Regions:
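Residue-level recognition of tetratricopeptide repeat
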Residues: 40, 74, 119-120
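Alpha-helical segment of the N-proximal tetratricopeptide repeat
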Residues: 5-32, 36
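Functional cores of ribonucleases/endoribonucleases
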Residues: 128-276
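Alpha-helical repeat scaffolds
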Residues: 25-31, 58-70, 102-114
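Start-of-helix register in tetratricopeptide repeats
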Residues: 9, 42, 81-84, 88
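Structural motif corresponding to the intra-repeat A-B loop/turn of tetratricopeptide repeats
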Residues: 20-21, 54, 100
């Protein structure tokens, strides 16, 4: 997410990176940062975004309300900077509407604010909003995701992920030959009842752990991502990932691997050997 001048750019860059790799840690780190630099207003934009990713939308709205009041009352802000803040606050409030599935309100806003769609590059979100509210007016559905949002089909999903069962290369994500796809799909709905990580407007993201599940960018990994249509258990994509620092990954090993025992890290081995 774009940000304005900050007190410690390296720290802000690190937090921005954490939003994708470990949003729970990003939440903690931005709180610490704002405790040190409470006047860094863009930090509250970042904080609200992180809270939305984690599904804490009520807290996010409180942060945005306080920030909006502060921005509007700050007479020293330039017109350009004030407009930037208001634009980002609006963008995040729209994501809260999407998280709560208030799609009719979202549609009404987009239909009356086409310049905002262009400015924030939300043409795809505007299309999906028209789909879920039944306002396509005869438009053709372009692409896999649009069709799945309009009319979910599990067979299409299974066909779509076949590309992740091909030959391993340095650039792709592929599951291992013995990945138990059907068993995984049988158990996944049990973990999809609550929304996952919410990075956009219409999908949830979950991270699952299964030892030896596949490869990402040519590197072995025990983790894979599952993407669903927001608020449903309709899976639209899944693939191995290297984003292994998620603290809320879901471990499937005890269920799918009979006789499973946790892998012992080198640190654990050292501690066991020299424990006194």
């Amino acid at each position: 997410m774009k940000f304005v001048n900050c007190y410690n750019k390296l720290e802000i860059d690190r937090i921005n990176d954490l939003v994708k790799t470990n949003p729970l840690l990003a939440k903690s780190e931005i709180e610490k940062y704002l405790a040190k630099y409470p006047n860094y207003d863009w930090g509250y934009v970042m904080q609200a975004n992180i809270l939305i990713v984690l599904g804490e939308v009520q807290k996010a709205n409180e942060v945005l309300n306080a920030l909006e009041e502060k921005v509007k009352s700050n007479k020293r802000l330039s017109k350009e900077l004030r407009e930037l803040y208001i634009s980002k606050i609006t963008y995040l409030r729209l994501r809260i509407l999407a998280y709560n599935r208030n799609y009719d309100i979202l549609y009404n806003f987009f239909s009356k604010n086409t310049e905002f769609i262009t400015k924030e590059k939300l043409a795809t979100e505007w299309l999906y909003t028209r789909i879920v509210t039944g306002n396509l007016n005869g438009e053709k559905l372009p692409g896999y995701l649009a069709n799945q949002i309009a009319n979910y089909n599990e067979v299409y999903f299974k066909n779509h992920i076949q590309k992740h069962f091909g030959v391993k290369t340095q650039d792709n994500s592929v599951f291992s030959e013995n990945f138990p796809l059907e068993k995984v799909l049988e158990h996944l709905p049990n973990y999809l009842e609550q929304p996952g990580l919410f990075y956009d407007y219409f999908t949830d993201k979950y991270i699952f752990k299964l030892d030896g599940c596949g490869f990402a960018s040519g590197i072995d990994t025990d983790l894979f991502e599952v993407i669903t249509i927001h608020g449903t258990d309709h899976i639209i994509n899944m693939y191995p990932t290297l984003e292994g620092t998620y603290t809320n990954s879901i471990d499937l090993n005890p269920i799918l691997n009979k006789g499973y025992s946790r892998k012992i890290s080198q640190i654990d081995k050292f501690n066991q050997r020299y424990k006194r």
